[in-house]
A protein has these predicted regions:
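Helix-to-loop junction immediately C-terminal to a conserved catalytic motif
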Residues: 61, 65, 351
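Conserved ABC transporter NBD signature motif
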Residues: 69-81, 359-367, 379
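Conserved ABC ATPase "signature" region
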Residues: 81, 133-152, 418-435, 544-545
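ABC ATPase NBD coupling module
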Residues: 82-99, 117, 125, 247-252, ...
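Conserved ABC ATPase signature
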Residues: 156-161, 165, 440-444, 448
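Conserved catalytic motifs of ABC-family nucleotide-binding domains
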Residues: 178, 461
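ABC ATPase "signature
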Residues: 239-243, 251, 522-526
């Protein structure tokens, strides 16, 4: 990738963006952006929310809202400026020359039409009129993207397929007409890590086999560096840095690009655990490694042999099968697993939202088995939850002060004045200004909303906090700020965390111990360092293998790759 001038030979470039500026009314959102994508090349636009990357992609696809957005500059596909092209002339380019893979496969497909019926629309772009020939081509491409039983998928409706299968379908429909360029907008952000790896591997293979160029939109620098030949780093609608992926990733020259690199979990595996160690060492007047920390005393959570069945479609489903784990006081234990692993059910059992069919759960030394609702409610005072998505977990009609105060009201803590004072103190502790208390969630950023959620959990001064994917909905730098805050709160308050995640790279940064769940069972558990350096189970190795590369020049391979690859294939089905 290189930035081109008007006098430069651009014969090898498929897509040229020159001086692109975009505004919504009087608000400019993209400022003089230029880049090019060569034939057969992959280029990633990387940036956080508000960086302008998706807006640029919409301009390339001619999907900017008509009458609301204005674009100036040049966007040339095979030498033709598509910004000035009449719609009648641009329409034939859609699908044939320019393909699009959206972020959410479930919303991109028509829920009341079969996959086959929708695939025939893509096949029609090939100019083939015979339905039988079209069907053959569709089944061939469904098989090529690795979907088991293409004929069944062809006859299925979207709701009958998993997220990973739906994304494969979208990729199949996109590549079927053999476009010259594919724009992929965060194509794996909603998928489990092993499925993400499979999808990206498949997209890379197809691109190379069919000589298709790729414009990848992502917020993840590690994925961009691993999958793209070139990078363009965006912030506030302007290019901060651009160049070969390896160069930008290994030695970023701008402060913003360096901050994105610093927030890649795989590059700093001990980031937050070391903070706890450093503080302990400072108090002791010496330095210690993580392994040298004194042993924790007392279990705050003890789960032994817990099972839980659910009825689904007339069948009994064993969601949790003999799960056991414990969390020591002041430590962080992680439950790791993908969709359907049982980790969410385990958390609901721990919180008393579901009752186990067997086994025992103890929180802060008190067994939850056979207790009255009032007793369980009192136990819940010691155990608070931070939800996954701060955009849906906070009541949009309430002001922040009331949201944070609600647990105090529920448990009857203190007088009204004392509650208000504790709310102010807790908001200050999580790094929010006092005036936030009078605002509603809609007026806060994603990071601020999650700080409010953390404040709500901490205001009753619990012993244990369950963190359910607490950063998965956030940009990487915002994620880093939240993890810094959680680490600080743990150091200062002696909190015990149960960290629920599907991302082992993130888990390595924050957890002391980990349990890996698959299909309702713990397949491996132990200290984080042991799990990372000496994984015993093929599924654990598959999760490790799915972590985006720490350095793009050195493949992140693990032992027994063949077994791990087979496990990855199973995880996607």
């Amino acid at each position: 990738m290189s930035l081109k001038t008007k006098d430069t030979d651009v014969s090898a470039d498929l897509l040229i963006v020159q001086g692109l500026s975009i505004a919504y009314g009087s608000a400019a959102v993209v400022h003089d952006v230029s880049f090019s994508v060569a034939k057969g090349e992959s280029l990633a636009l990387i940036g956080e929310s508000g960086s302008g990357k998706s807006t640029i992609a919409k301009a390339v696809l001619r999907l900017l809202p008509h009458g609301e957005a204005s674009a100036t500059g040049r966007v040339a596909l095979n030498g033709t400026d598509i910004l000035t092209l009449p719609e009648k002339q641009f329409r034939p380019l859609r699908g044939r020359e320019l393909g699009f893979i959206p972020q959410d496969p479930a919303s991109a497909l028509n829920p009341v039409r079969t996959i086959g019926a929708q695939a025939h629309e893509a096949a029609a772009l090939l100019g083939e009129t015979d339905p039988a020939v079209r069907r053959t081509k569709i089944l061939d491409i469904l098989e090529q993207v690795g979907l088991p039983d293409p004929a069944r998928v062809y006859d299925s409706y979207p709701h009958q397929l998993s997220g990973g299968m739906l994304q494969r379908v979208l990729i199949a429909l996109t590549v079927l007409p053999r476009p010259a360029l594919i724009v992929a907008d965060e194509p794996t952000s909603a998928l489990d890590v092993t499925v993400q790896k499979l999808i990206l591997d498949m997209l890379t293979d197809l691109r190379r086999e069919l000589d298709i160029s790729l414009l990848l939109i992502t917020h993840d620098l590690a994925i961009a560096a691993e999958r793209a030949d070139s990078l363009v780093v965006l912030k506030d609608g302007a290019v901060q840095e651009s160049g070969a992926s390896r160069d930008v990733f290994a030695a970023p020259t701008t402060e913003y690009a360096r901050s994105l690199q610093a927030d890649v979990p795989a590059l700093h595996p001990d980031r937050y655990r070391n903070q706890r160690v450093t503080l302990k060492a400072a108090h002791d007047g010496g330095s210690r490694t993580a392994a040298a920390l004194p042993p924790a005393v007392g279990r705050q959570i003890d789960v032994q042999g817990v099972t839980k069945h659910f009825s689904a479609g007339g069948k009994e489903v064993l969601a949790v099968d003999g799960v056991s784990f414990s969390v020591e006081r002041g430590r962080t234990h992680a439950l790791v697993g993908e969709s359907g692993s049982g980790k969410t059910t385990a958390v609901r059992l721990l919180l008393g939202l579901e009752q186990p069919d067997g086994g025992d759960i103890t929180v802060a030394g008190q067994s939850t088995s056979g207790r009255s609702r009032a007793d369980v409610r009192e136990i819940r005072r010691h155990l608070q939850l931070v939800y996954q998505n701060p955009f849906t977990s906070l009541d949009p009609t309430w002001r922040v002060g009331r949201i944070v105060r609600e647990p105090l009201d529920q448990f009857g803590v203190g007088t009204k004045a004392e509650r208000s004072q504790r709310v102010r103190e807790t908001l200050e502790a999580v790094g929010l200004p006092a005036d936030v208390a009078s605002r509603r969630p809609a007026h806060l950023s994603g990071g601020q909303r999650q700080r409010v959620a953390i404040a709500r959990a901490l205001v009753v001064r619990p012993d244990v906090v369950v963190l359910d994917e607490p950063t998965s909905a956030l940009d990487v730098s915002v994620q880093a700020g939240i993890l810094e805050l959680l680490s600080k709160m743990q150091r200062e308050l002696g909190l015990t965390y149960l960290f629920v995640s599907h991302d082992l790279a993130l888990v390595r940064q924050v957890a002391d111990t980990v349990s890996v769940l698959r299909r309702g069972q713990v397949v491996e558990d132990g200290p984080v360092e042991d799990i990372f350096h000496r994984p015993q189970h093929p599924y654990t190795r598959a999760l490790l293998d799915a972590i985006p590369l720490a350095t793009p020049s050195v493949p992140a391979k693990h032992e027994d790759d063949e077994t791990a690859s087979k496990q990855l294939a199973k995880a996607s089905s």
